Every structure is written in C-alpha cells, then in structure tokens.
Design a protein with these regions (language model features):
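Non-cytosolic coordination micro-motifs
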Residues: 27-77, 107-187
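Hydrophobic/aromatic beta-strand elements that line small-molecule binding cavities or substrate pockets
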Residues: 92-97, 153-155
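Glycine-rich, often proline-containing surface loops adjacent to acidic residues and nearby aromatics
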Residues: 99-107
C-alpha cells in the first residue's frame, strides 16, 4: 500500500507562506507577471494559469486536469490529475489549488525508488543550489525560496515504500487572494 503525502490545504499554505514571505521582498501587484525567479519542477510552476497546466499534463501523457470550484469562495478551484512520465519515475499524482484560475499551490506526488528520488534531488540542486535535507517528523525535506515563492521536496519511507512529493507555492497569488478576502470582509 502506497502512502501519499497530503497536498497542503490552502489555509495551511497561507500560514506556511506567511513565514516564508516575511523574509522575502515585496511582491509585484500582478500575480501573473513572469520573472526569472520562478521555481519550477518538470515544467510545473506555481503562478501558472490552469490552462497552461492542463496543456502541460496533456503534452506529457494525454491526460487532463479535473477541477472543482470551492462552494464557499467560487474563485478557488481544487484540481487533480494523474500522469505517467518515465522521467518522473512513472505515475505521478498532481494537485492544484488555484485562485482566479492561477495556481497558488501545486503538489506532485509519486511512489519512487532510491534512484528516482536521487534524480529529483540532483535536478533541483543543480538548478537552485545545494541545501541540506532536514527531518520533519517521519519525513525529510529540502526547500528553496525565491522572491515569495517556495519549492519543497519531501519524502518518506513507510513499510518499505518510498513516497516523494514536490510542492510549489506562489506567495504572490496567495497574498493577493488574502488581500481581496480581507477587503471584501471589511465594512
């Protein structure tokens, strides 16, 4: 039985990002503006529009992103897909939390062997720099932060099976959502 790492809930992502954002410079007001600090993994990047992510999944294996709108805030979409890609080690589950069709949080999760996990680590470290792996309960994680964005590689072994996930968070998208919610709630 494979134990999947859970995708962060939007509220949890906001709390985690508040800690990350406090040390980051102020974000531009346009949450979809492109710049070179965009953290990405295998073409997936937080801050991408849902159409871009759906196209990427379709190009990788022909699948599609399936989205449901939140009942409480119709601007929020929770999307899922599964893709098969040999470069990622096989079947990968994809979760996206989007606000106004822009991805604030993306999580890719898969059962991996040691070689695949090492390949994921090397790919990220060669692109973003070496960071030490840190224990987090029964899991291990490596994290990179750039200009209000975060990429985290997390892995664990449970009953002999290794599961890894990459989470990409765009604080600009989540911060803008928080500002709009606060403005709508104030009299």
């Amino acid at each position: 039985m494979t134990h999947m790492l859970r995708a962060p809930a939007p509220a949890l992502a906001l709390v985690a990002l508040a800690l990350v954002s406090s040390a980051a410079p102020a974000a531009p007001s346009d949450p979809t503006a492109q710049d070179t600090s965009a953290l990405q993994f295998h073409g997936f990047r937080a801050g991408a529009r849902l159409g871009e992510l759906d196209g990427l999944i379709h190009r990788l294996d022909g699948g599609r992103l399936r989205c449901d709108r939140a009942r409480r805030d119709r601007r929020v979409s929770e999307c899922r897909s599964t893709l098969r890609d040999s470069a990622l080690g096989g079947a990968v589950k994809v979760w996206v939390s989007a606000i106004d069709s822009v991805a604030g949080v993306i999580t890719l999760s898969a059962g991996v062997d040691a070689q695949t996990l090492d390949r994921w680590k090397r790919r990220l470290e060669s692109r973003y720099g070496r960071v030490g792996a840190k224990p987090q309960g029964s899991q291990w994680m490596m994290q990179w932060v750039r200009r209000g964005r975060m990429l985290r590689l997390t892995w664990r072994t449970d009953r002999g099976e290794r599961t890894a996930s990459v989470s990409l968070v765009d604080g600009r998208v989540l911060d803008e959502w928080g500002r709009k919610r606060a403005a709508a709630a104030s009299p």
